[in-house]
From Swiss-Prot:
It is found in: Cell inner membrane. One of its GO terms (cellular component) is plasma membrane. CDD domains: ATP-synt_Fo_b. Belongs to the ATPase B chain family. It comes from Polaromonas naphthalenivorans (strain CJ2). Keywords: ATP synthesis, Cell inner membrane, Cell membrane, CF(0), Hydrogen ion transport, Ion transport, Membrane, Transmembrane, Transmembrane helix, Transport. One of its GO terms (molecular function) is proton-transporting ATP synthase activity, rotational mechanism. It is a single-pass membrane protein. This is ATP synthase subunit b. The chain crosses the membrane at residues 7-27.
Length: 156
């Protein structure tokens, strides 16, 4: 074989190889590469979508946290106000009860003072009668002199 025919024959074989490769080998390879590229693009799109969903979920969570914080602060303030009101009511009731107890004690003390004065008046009247009896050296009849004794009690 001659170099020219060999070269021509090799060029024909090479052309057949290129045609065979382009017809039967190249399409499955390009199809596989295209599918792989599509999967990668879908994965990146899903990652971007998940990232945006995560961002929006984080924003919703932050909004909910802010809402719950303000609600908690409001409830704590309400509870504190109610607690202060209950304490003030209890103090007012305690002061009122103390005033009632003091008034009752003062009334009882005044009543006992009146009773003690009456008892002392009667004792003084008896002592005065006994003293007068001893001075006069004779017995004074309480029934006969009841008017005199009652006037003496009122004067004392």
């Amino acid at each position: 074989m001659n170099i020219n025919s060999t070269l021509f024959l090799q060029a024909v074989v090479f052309a057949i190889l290129v045609w065979f490769t382009m017809k039967f080998v190249w399409p499955p390879i390009t199809k596989a590469l295209d599918e792989r590229a599509q999967k990668i693009a879908d994965g990146l799109a899903a990652a971007d979508k998940a990232k945006s969903e995560l961002s929006s979920a984080n924003k919703r969570v932050e909004a909910e946290l802010a809402t719950s914080r303000t609600e908690t602060a409001t409830r704590l303030a309400d509870a504190d106000r109610r607690g202060q009101g209950i304490i003030e009511d209890a103090k007012a009731r305690a002061v009122e009860e103390a005033n009632k107890i003091i008034a009752a004690a003062q009334a009882e003390a005044a009543q006992q003072s009146v009773k003690a004065r009456e008892a002392l008046r009667e004792q003084v009247a008896l002592l005065a009668v006994k003293g007068a009896e001893q001075i006069l050296r004779k017995e004074v009849n309480a029934g006969v002199h009841a008017d005199l004794l009652s006037r003496l009690k009122t004067e004392l």
